[in-house]
Design a protein with these regions (language model features):
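Catalytic cores of secreted or luminal carbohydrate-active enzymes
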Residues: 238-288
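Structural recognition of the beta-strand scaffold that forms the well-ordered cores
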Residues: 7-12, 41-47, 86-91, 121-126, ...
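Aromatic-lined carbohydrate-binding/catalytic grooves of carbohydrate-active enzymes
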Residues: 28-132
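Carbohydrate-binding surface patches
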Residues: 243-246, 251-253, 290-332
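Solvent-exposed beta-strand/loop surfaces of large extracellular or lumenal domains
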Residues: 336-356
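C-terminal beta-strand-rich structural cap/linker in extracellular carbohydrate-active enzymes
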Residues: 352-376
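Glycan-recognition surfaces
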Residues: 107, 138, 149, 155-255, ...
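N-terminal module-boundary/linker segments of secreted carbohydrate-active enzymes
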Residues: 1-23, 31
Length: 376
């Protein structure tokens, strides 16, 4: 199975944690279609931890909790598929999941076969309760082999939180996406920390094995399982801009049944999503090496010759950020310029021929442009 674009979808953990059931999943599937998320590219609906009973069945298989999922997981998968969506589930490389439910250690091939029988299309694979003598590369390779031999295409989302320098070995496991960070929390400090953690590993991002900066918190506003304080709408926009420019998977974590209009517009911004989903999937690169002044300028070369540039003010004070043609790599003697479009305002903002300075960016604000190289 080859995955050419960063996966997009919804995951239950950020908002609901253990408070999941069949009704929630069915309603979320309905809204993913009715509210335009599927059309925008969000195709995976993923149930995270806490979906099973505390003990395996007599046949050794994991048993879905009959109170939460009275019709079983095959019925849930069938409903999700009937909406044109793909269905995802969760397990762990240890003996227990992070919440203490049965996990897949030494049951990898059985669990992969079970997931395939249920119609699972996506597996998030966490990193809790593994034996001390075991190492992450072997355990993730083992599940990678099990999924590759289960008879069904199942996207493998490896979630070991960036431990053991996983960026150096994760591709060998067969993972299609890999968590490079610890868990995100719904506050600005967490978003900023996850951004800063990318400065030394950006070059390991690549098509088919995508650097996952964790699920989106856009629209949570402090509510739910990881809702520790919440963010402002502007901070959510910065969060979404960086994840998209970086090419991270976009997995929504809010309750999409209750998200407000502003955050729905963020999540459904087709121009920003197009940057994340660019078919060339070239690595982004930092133009200012994360300056000590707290600003970040990051660029990504896109299919067809365009470039995307993000300006990020991570400080607590207003900032204006500069960009020159030379920063991008266009020499002044080339006779070329850069026609720029603001992807949040959806408007052309002029042509860069020398130096561009952003409008004043409020604390934690950002600007994302798409540039087209033109003759002067």
């Amino acid at each position: 199975m080859i995955v050419r674009k960063p996966p997009m979808g919804w995951n239950s953990w950020n908002t609901f944690a253990a408070d999941i059931n069949e009704k929630l999943i069915f309603e979320t599937a309905d809204r993913m279609v009715a509210d335009g998320y599927l059309d925008a590219g969000y195709e995976y609906l993923v149930i995270d931890d806490c979906w099973s009973l505390r003990e395996r069945g007599e046949d050794g298989r994991i048993v879905p909790d009959p109170e939460k999922f009275p019709h079983g997981m095959k019925a849930v998968a069938d409903y999700v598929h009937s909406k044109g969506l793909k269905f995802g589930m969760y397990s762990c490389c240890g003996s227990l999941t992070c919440a203490g439910f049965p996990a897949s250690y030494e049951h990898e091939f059985l669990d992969a076969a079970t997931f395939a029988e249920w119609g699972v299309d996506f597996l998030k694979y966490d990193n809790c309760y593994k034996p001390q003598e075991e190492n992450d590369p072997k355990l993730y390779r083992r599940m990678g082999m099990a999924l590759a031999n289960c008879g069904r295409d199942i996207l493998f989302s490896a979630c070991n939180w960036g431990a053991d320098e996983s960026h150096k070995w994760i591709k060998e496991t067969g993972a299609h996406m890999w968590r490079s960070t610890g868990d995100i929390m719904d506050n600005w400090a967490s978003v900023k920390s996850l951004i800063e953690q990318q400065k030394n590993i950006w070059q390991y991002n690549g098509q088919g094995c995508f650097n996952d900066m964790d699920m989106l918190i856009v629209g949570m506003y402090g509510k739910g399982n990881v809702g520790l304080g919440g963010c402002s709408t502007e901070e959510y926009r910065t969060h979404f801009s960086f994840w998209s420019l970086y090419g991270s998977p976009l997995m929504m974590g809010c309750d999409i049944r209750a998200v407000n209009d502003e955050c729905r517009e963020i999540l459904l911004n087709r121009e920003v999503i197009a940057v994340d989903q660019d078919e060339a999937y070239r690595q982004p690169f930092f133009l200012n090496a994360m300056h000590n002044d707290g600003t970040v300028v990051m660029c990504r070369l896109l299919e067809g010759g365009d470039v995307a540039v993000g300006f990020f003010n991570l400080t607590d004070s207003p900032r204006r950020i500069s960009l020159t043609l030379g920063d991008i790599g266009i020499n002044t003697s080339s006779g070329k310029a850069l026609a720029m479009r603001d992807l949040w305002k959806h408007e052309e903002i002029g042509t860069l021929t020398g130096i561009y300075r952003t409008p004043e960016l409020a604390p934690h604000a950002s600007m994302l442009i798409r540039g087209r190289i033109v003759d002067r």
